[in-house]
Design a protein with these regions (language model features):
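Structural recognition of the beta-strand scaffold that forms the well-ordered cores
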Residues: 1, 62, 121-122
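Glycine-rich, charge-decorated loop segments at or immediately adjacent to ligand/cofactor-binding or catalytic sites
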Residues: 2-15
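Conserved anion/nucleotide-ligand pocket segment
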Residues: 14-97
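Catalytic-loop motifs flanking and including active-site residues across diverse enzymes
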Residues: 32, 118, 182
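Short gly/pro-enriched beta-turn/loop segments at secondary-structure junctions
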Residues: 55-57, 113-118, 162-164
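Glycine-rich, aromatic-lined ligand/substrate-binding cores of catalytic
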Residues: 67-150, 154
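Conserved functional hotspot residues or short segments at active or partner-binding sites
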Residues: 123-192
Length: 192
């Protein structure tokens, strides 16, 4: 969904693998699923419980997509969207995920729109001063991303029915935005 030109973020360190960071590759890796499969297979990134296991290398065939170009977003492919997760209901959710998804793993630290109609688009909590948070984030002058104040009550999940305050983010220039770092700037701002 992010196209094939965006590559950014840290690589997971050995010993810190998880469901969302299984391989030593950047958080945003700029590859198609087929290219990723080839890289994992050819570079020996498959590993067993004790590390690299050459027996896990397989005979792999990848069929290239017709008409796809690296600069294309998912929407530009014209393909219908198929939900990879209930919390990623539309292509923009997948585009926003790298900007907030890590924050969502911190056990209810901040609500990122899950349980509401804006999954992966917000950073909010009951205790946040939304105006102060927006002002702090605006002072960082982050390229390609902007924030607006938001107040909402999730309709599902651990924050269901709670009035949350915070910011909704949106891209003003996706190519210029360092989307992976956004969530870390937000965490810095809420802890000031």
């Amino acid at each position: 969904p992010l196209g094939g030109l965006k590559v950014e973020g840290c690589c997971v360190e050995p010993g810190y693998y998880s469901f969302v960071s299984e391989f030593e590759i950047p958080y945003i890796y700029g590859l198609t699923v087929g290219e990723l499969a080839i890289m994992i297979n050819e570079e020996g990134l498959n590993r067993g419980e004790k590390g690299y296991d050459p027996a896990l290398k397989c005979k792999l065939s990848v069929i290239p997509m017709d008409g796809w170009r690296r600069k294309m977003s998912y929407i530009e492919t014209g393909l219908p969207w198929v939900l990879p997760s209930p919390n990623i209901p539309y292509p923009q959710s997948a585009v926003n995920y790298p900007s907030s998804g890590i924050t969502g793993e911190f056990n209810n630290y901040l609500n990122i729109g899950i349980g509401y109609t804006l999954p992966f688009e917000t950073f909010a909590a009951e205790w946040i001063d939304a105006g102060a948070l927006k002002k702090e984030l605006d002072s960082y002058n982050l390229p390609g991303i902007a924030f607006r104040i938001i107040h909402y009550k999730p309709i599902a999940g651990s924050s269901k029915g709670k009035l949350l305050h915070g910011v909704q983010f949106y891209y003003t220039d996706y190519e210029a935005a360092d989307i992976t770092l956004t969530q870390f700037y937000v965490m810095q701002a809420v802890n000031r």
